[in-house]
């Protein structure tokens, strides 16, 4: 973790590598992280906005509207058919308690923190040998 007020650098992930990572995570039954990476790549949402999403917002819809946490702006996002299919597949495997439940819930039943997500992403980078310097 970086020091407060320090400058950090994030690196980019090549599109084909991102798509391969999404497929590998799903194949390994890590549907929560597969969904996280897919939503991040396809929508460009910040992690704080992804963590605030609920199943009823993204399941079986062509588009959805959110108010971004950081900027307070209203934003409408369209979901392509490939992502819609992946969301449905993840929903069926994750088996949440209901459609109003948050999409990313820990085993304890709480929403993941950003720090936990960063730790998990670091582990994913190592396990799947993702070619990227700074992953967040």
Segments and roles (model prediction):
Residues 17, 43, 52-85:
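Conserved tyrosine-mediated DNA breakage-rejoining catalytic core shared by Y-recombinases
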Residues 32-39, 55, 79, 117-121:
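Non-catalytic DNA-binding core/recognition domains of DNA-processing enzymes
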Residues 88-94, 132-134:
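Charged, surface-exposed interaction regions in soluble eukaryotic proteins
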Residues 49-51, 133-136:
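Active-site-proximal segment of tyrosine recombinases
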Residues 7, 69-89, 100-122:
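C-terminal catalytic core of Y-nucleophile DNA break-rejoin enzymes
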Residues 22-23, 118-126:
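Amphipathic, well-packed alpha-helical segments that form the structural scaffold of globular domains
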Residues 2, 12-43, 47, 96-98, ...:
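Basic, Lys/Arg- and aromatic-enriched nucleic-acid-binding interface segment
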């Amino acid at each position: 973790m970086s020091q407060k007020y320090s400058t950090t650098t994030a690196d980019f992930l090549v599109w084909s590598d991102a798509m391969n990572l999404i497929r590998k995570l799903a194949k390994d039954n890590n549907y929560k992280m597969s969904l996280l990476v897919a939503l991040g790549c396809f929508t460009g949402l910040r992690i704080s906005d992804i963590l605030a999403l609920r199943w009823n917002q993204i399941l079986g819809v062509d588009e959805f509207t959110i108010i971004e946490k950081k900027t307070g702006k209203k934003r409408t996002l369209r979901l392509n058919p490939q992502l819609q299919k992946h969301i449905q597949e993840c929903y069926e495997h994750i088996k949440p308690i209901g459609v109003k439940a948050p999409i990313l819930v820990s085993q304890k039943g709480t929403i993941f923190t950003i720090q936990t997500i960063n730790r998990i992403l670091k582990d994913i980078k190592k396990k799947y040998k993702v070619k990227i310097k700074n992953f967040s």
